[in-house]
């Protein structure tokens, strides 16, 4: 009887929903997992999962320069794993880096998870050092996605694509094959 009781308690503990923390780097995920313990699952996105396709412009110029995003080739498995974990979780904590790229990564992942499991709360957390105190403080004070940072990253990405896709072919034709043009590659 005592053994059955222990097994039941163990099963109840294992069935408790955990909080999913998503970071960009697998090394960070491993370290953070040690600090947060058994109530959390920490996964890595391995950086961007969503971007513009490489094979075409993918900027809808007639619709306010709206980008046409896709899941990056080879990243669907990671995205599906994150969505699967999110469905089983109590909440999702998006902990990508605190910069434009990180905010964009968090925004894209949040949208994909929200589409797959709308009932799971999704929060954005930010920390600037990987310590137990910094992580706990970030978890206690979640914030919304900074849409201004997301829009800044989107604008940069759209400009890069427009400049590169339109000017690079001209360079190949007029100067030399293999040259490329970009927002930060050319003299201002």
Which residues are covered by each model-predicted region?
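Intrinsically disordered, low-complexity regulatory segments
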Residues: 1-157, 163-166, 171, 186-187
């Amino acid at each position: 009887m005592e053994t059955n009781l222990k097994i039941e308690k163990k099963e109840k503990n294992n069935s408790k929903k955990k909080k999913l923390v998503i970071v960009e780097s697998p090394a960070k995920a491993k370290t953070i997992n040690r600090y947060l313990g058994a109530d959390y699952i920490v996964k890595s996105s391995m950086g961007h999962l969503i971007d513009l396709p490489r094979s075409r412009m993918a900027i809808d110029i007639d619709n306010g320069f709206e980008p046409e995003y896709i899941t990056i080739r080879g990243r669907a498995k990671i995205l599906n794993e994150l969505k699967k974990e999110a469905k089983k979780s109590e909440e999702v904590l998006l902990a990508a880096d605190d910069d434009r790229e990180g905010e964009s990564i968090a925004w894209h992942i949040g949208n994909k998870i929200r589409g797959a499991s709308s009932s799971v709360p999704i929060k954005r957390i930010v920390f600037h050092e990987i310590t137990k105190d910094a992580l706990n403080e970030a978890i206690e004070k979640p914030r919304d996605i900074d849409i201004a940072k997301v829009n800044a990253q989107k604008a940069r990405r759209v400009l890069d694509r427009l400049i590169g896709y339109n000017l690079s072919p001209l360079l190949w034709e007029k100067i030399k094959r293999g040259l490329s043009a970009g927002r930060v590659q050319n003299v201002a």
